[in-house]
Amino acid sequence: MPLPIFPSRLQCSSSSSSSSSRSSFFRPKLRIDPSLTLIPGLSNDVGRLILSFVPYPHISRIKSTCKSWYAFLSSKTLISLRHSRDNSNTNNLSHLLCIFPQDPSISPPFLFDPVTLSWRSLPLMPCNPHVYGLCNFVAVALGPYVYVLGGSAFDTRSYPLDVPLPTSSVFRYSFVKSVWERLSPMMSPRGSFACAAMPGSCGRIIVAGGGSRHTLFGAAGSRMSSVEMYDVEKDEWRVMNELPRFRAGCVGFLVENEKEKEKEEEGREFWVMGGYGGSRTVSGILPVDEYYKDAVVMDLRVDGGEKWRVVGDMWGEEERPKLGKIVAVDCGKPVFFMLDKDWILRYEMGLNRWRKESSVPKKAHYDKPVGFVALNGELHVMILLDGYNLMDTRHTRQQRKAGSLMIHMYDPKKKTWRSVVSKPPFNHQLDFRTTVMCTIRL
């Protein structure tokens, strides 16, 4: 006896089969129901605030918890919320190190968290097909952005081809949009210059000095004394009073005057330390730089009355030939520290002298380059343990993988040291002589 036929069931079956066939050919983009809450029992506003306190390097790990978390943690709202929840206190943000091992247009930069020892790569910077070998650029952070300014590179359109030229290009990486942006170039091309970011309601960046020297050459290159200031909102550069003399290879810091700290712009000073100006020759053949032992300071004022004052020599004739690597730490007020071989020196501003603060607990092999940065109020001495030799050629170093990274951390308030070891994710050697680093809070 034949089975009865039910049209409704056939219709349902056919519709389901056609639906499945359509879904196999057309895969619409997954949409998340906006009515779903991030955390059950709490409003989305509260849930977003709670998730915004997660340390930045851990965000990629918790994205896969659920669809709503993935949508929020991948959105532009996250970074904006982390920076806007308390503008007066940035200690709640993760203090990270941004490392540029090589030319950022051919080798990606990385973010490093010294607390969790986690690494995260960033996209490549836009490439110019005519320019290669960018080095001696400056990276500085301002808000949720990292700026890459200037540098020295080779240009295939110039002659002779083996002469490096300074560049005036400026790029900015936005952690909100996760993209690189090209900004207005500097008025004067420069590399190896002093630079400092001025946070506030109207963010600004100031640059001073510089030249055209490339890392492939130990001497030669131009020097300059020009000073410029960049307005972030207007995307414009303006000329400021020049340095008292030519100065390249220098470093810059922003210092706030405690008496006028409530005045956003007027209580600031721009310090430019070290560097070199003229040169001399040994036996009439070998060029040798003449390094400066002093510093110059500019008082930054709204009325445009910027003036430079010269600070005398910071050390004697027989102490050291040139300034070492310098960082600034906020110990209630900015304090300068310098790494001089295996010693940490503190700058006594009243005496205008560098005094010994502490020694690195484990002596580094000083035939290797050493990194020196300030993070979370601590000094970080970064030493590559293995896989590096100064006698290796440039090609050989690029073929080898990076070794382990020993980081000695010094707390200036507690006068204590601690050490950690991390494995960098680079597929090439890390050379601290040419590596560019800056810190950022996210």
Curated annotation (Swiss-Prot):
The keyword Repeat belongs to this UniProt entry's keyword annotation: yes
Residues of the F-box domain: 37-84
Keywords, alphabetical: Kelch repeat, Repeat
Superkingdom of this protein's organism: Eukaryota
Renumbered ranges of Kelch repeats: 93-139, 145-200, 204-257, 269-328, 330-377, 390-437
Pfam family name, one: F-box
Keyword Repeat: yes
Name of this protein: F-box/kelch-repeat protein OR23
Gene it is expressed from: OR23
